[in-house]
């Protein structure tokens, strides 16, 4: 488990922010703000989010309890299954690209649970 410490100055964000604004815009926001980490949620409850900064949508309702990653086979074997978000068809590629961009810019990437 990654613990926040005095050296972590993080942007907490949602996958829909990265998808809507783009990887480079998120990385740029972290750097311009003097931050060194991104904490991004991997699972979230329902709600209504106002997104005045977004050019794609002004309000977003996430899928209740959705996962923002492809779970292991263990997940498929149980009766209680959180839905996998349909924001993207390829969560593995989403995480690979975000991880790569963070590494290139010396930004720590952490899961916000």
Segments and roles (model prediction):
Residues 2-21:
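Boundary/entry segment of secreted carbohydrate-active catalytic domains
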Residues 2-3, 30-31, 95-110:
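Surface-exposed amphipathic alpha-helices with a cationic face
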Residues 9-13, 38-40, 109-111:
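Hydrophobic faces of well-ordered beta-strands that scaffold small-molecule active sites
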Residues 15-17, 44-46, 113:
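Active-site-proximal loop/turn and secondary-structure-junction residues that shape catalytic pockets
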Residues 16-17, 88-89, 102:
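Residue-level marker of alpha-helix boundaries and capping positions
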Residues 21-27, 93-98:
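Short alpha-helical segments and helix-capping/turn motifs at coil-helix boundaries
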Residues 48-92:
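Aromatic- and acidic-residue-enriched carbohydrate-binding clefts of CAZyme catalytic domains
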């Amino acid at each position: 488990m990654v613990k926040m410490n005095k050296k972590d100055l993080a942007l907490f964000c949602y996958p829909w922010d990265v998808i809507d604004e783009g990887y480079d815009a998120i990385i740029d926001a972290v750097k311009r703000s003097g931050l060194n980490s991104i904490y991004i949620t991997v699972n979230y409850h329902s709600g209504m989010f106002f997104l005045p900064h977004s050019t794609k949508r002004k309000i977003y309702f996430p899928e209740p309890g959705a996962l923002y990653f492809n779970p292991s086979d263990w997940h498929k074997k149980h009766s209680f299954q959180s839905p996998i978000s349909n924001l993207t068809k390829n969560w593995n590629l989403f995480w690979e690209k975000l991880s790569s961009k963070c590494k290139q810019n010396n930004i720590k990437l952490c899961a916000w649970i």
